[in-house]
Amino acid sequence: DAFQAKVLGAVSAAQHVHLLAEHYGICAVLHTDHANRKLVPWIDALVDHSEEYYKENGKALYSSHMLDLSEEDIDDNLNECARMLERMAKLDMSLEIELGITGGEEDGVGHDIEEGADSSHLYTQPEDVLKAYDLLTPIGHFSVAASFGNVHGVYKPGNVQLRPEILKNSQELVSKTHGTAEKPLNLVFHGGSGSEKDKIAAAISYGVFKMNIDTDTQFAFAEGVGKYVEEHMTAFKYQIDPETGAPLKKYYDPRKWLRQGELSFIKRLDEAFEDLGSAGRSLAK
């Protein structure tokens, strides 16, 4: 059935990554993004598989999962996150939660961004972050996808204003309340695509350790494929060149044009590594 297919697809993908990571001696972090209420059973099923994998390998299939219940009441959101983290913490896994709504659309799920609309719901309240910290810290490791005007996708400039200082305010409130170190929270920057470099730098300085750039990487992949298709348009209309009679298989072979997408994708990742200060660094070293 469709549900089982989604579970097995995620499990087999993780197993493939673990196999290659071990072969090449690299550190691979596997994470599932934005699971709303209807996808909670899918996450539970993946944790089931991680429990079995952990028994044999001493590690979980996935490093972390995300629950995005930001549209729900804060207590309902956090209580479900606490339940899930109880399971995951036993496997040394981390849970990512979302507080405040990140606008735009991510894989068909999102919130409309309209010019002139009230965007107050796009900003996380530090008090909610403190509430999450109080409930989840005793259970296990978690990170917070806090909303500070960031949106999924790329939108017309001016529709939403990034306010990374909200991240600083959350860090300061938790630190002051509990007497912790300067930045006790692990924060995630969703909707990083198209963001200004100075805003990215500010977010990192306030404790962001992960930034999502799905839209930019999708575009980079499509751009690489698109350029290749433009350069070899005849091969995408005919199997044999109508003028020369030469076979065109070596041009329309999917391995050729998909590789161009990969190379363009890699170039965008290299840019992100520089922006985030992670170029040349590895958790495995």
Q: Which role does the model predict for each range below?
A:
Residues 230-285:
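Extended, intrinsically disordered, low-complexity segments
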Residues 33-35, 68, 190-192:
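Conserved acidic functional residues
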Residues 29-33, 95-96, 188:
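Structural detector of well-ordered beta-strand residues that form the stable sheet scaffold
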Residues 128-131, 220, 224, 264:
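Exposed alpha-helical structural elements
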Residues 3, 119-122, 160, 193, ...:
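Hydrophobic alpha-helical scaffolding
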Residues 1-3, 7-25, 36-183, 197-202, ...:
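Alpha/beta enzyme core
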Residues 21-22, 151, 156, 166, ...:
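Catalytic-face loop-and-helix region of soluble metabolic enzyme cores
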Residues 135, 224, 228, 275:
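Residues that form generic nucleotide/phosphate-binding pockets
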